[in-house]
Structure formats: structure tokens, C-alpha cells
Amino acid sequence: MRKEKLTYYFSVEGETEKWYLDWLQDRINESRDAKYTVKLDSKIQKDPLARAKGMTILQKTEITHVFDRESGDSVHARQFMATLDRMKAAQSLGKNIKYRLGYSNFTFELWIILHKANCNGAKTHRRQYLAPLNTAYGEHFESLEEYKHEANFQRILLHCHRESQR
């Protein structure tokens, strides 16, 4: 019996979020226990309004914008508020779009860490996620930039997949 297909729309800030959603789609669709097949339609687009303008909408559509705040610095706080304003503007295009907030803490790395470990305690800067990330996955990345190279990130996702198979 063929499964019904559900589509979910995302705009994401960067490559790691896109790679993660592609990986998640594959894991869901390969599961025999899944009631549906899914399409996680994600585009790297920091501006929610640009994502909405680029879509042909035939029916009411929800889009989730996944982004992080980076830090408590005023520049990042302003960027965060500007993104919220652009989400509101996207909903006013007359395209029947509902934009949802997919906020991911200071950094998307928290999502990845939580696949393997608890991450208790306050973190005030994104660089503080490097040590828990290395510990959780037995890695030795010297920077978050090194971790974000596609081959390294895909290795982390493969590790997540192997763990879920146990």
C-alpha cells in the first residue's frame, strides 16, 4: 500500500540546517513504521520574505524559518528582530502563507548535540558548544567552522543514524 505524502516547507540560515533536514527526510522515508512519506522542502534563505516571494502557492501553506540568534550582542538581537519582521511581511504578501518560527538557540549545534547528550547549563556564546559537540561524537574539531565542512557534518549525521538503528 502506498503511503500518503506530506510536504513541509522550511527556510534555513545555512548549509548545516539544510543538510540536517535532508538527512531527517531520508530517515523518516526509509522507516517502515512511518505512516507517511515526507518531503521537507528546505531552501537556504536567510530572508523569509524572499523565500515566500519565490514560491508558487496554490493553497494555505506553512513555512518554518529555522535560524539562530548567534549571541546576545546588539547586532545579533537586531538581526533576530529583523527576521521576525520579515516573517510578518511574508505573511502579508497575499499568498496565504503562515510563517512559523523555528528558532534554534544561539546555534544549530545544540540540536545536533541533543541527539547524543544532555546539554545542561547556560551557554552565552556559540563557541561554548564545540566541547560538548566533540564529546558527544568522539571528535576533535578545533572550531565550529571545521565541524561545518560537509564531510564532517555528514559523518556526524551518519553517527546519529547508526545510533538510531541500535
Go through the PLM ranges and name each one:
Residues 44-48:
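Short, charge-patterned binding micro-sites
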Residues 1-7, 18-38, 49-62, 69-166:
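C-terminal accessory helical subdomains adjacent to catalytic cores in phosphodiester-
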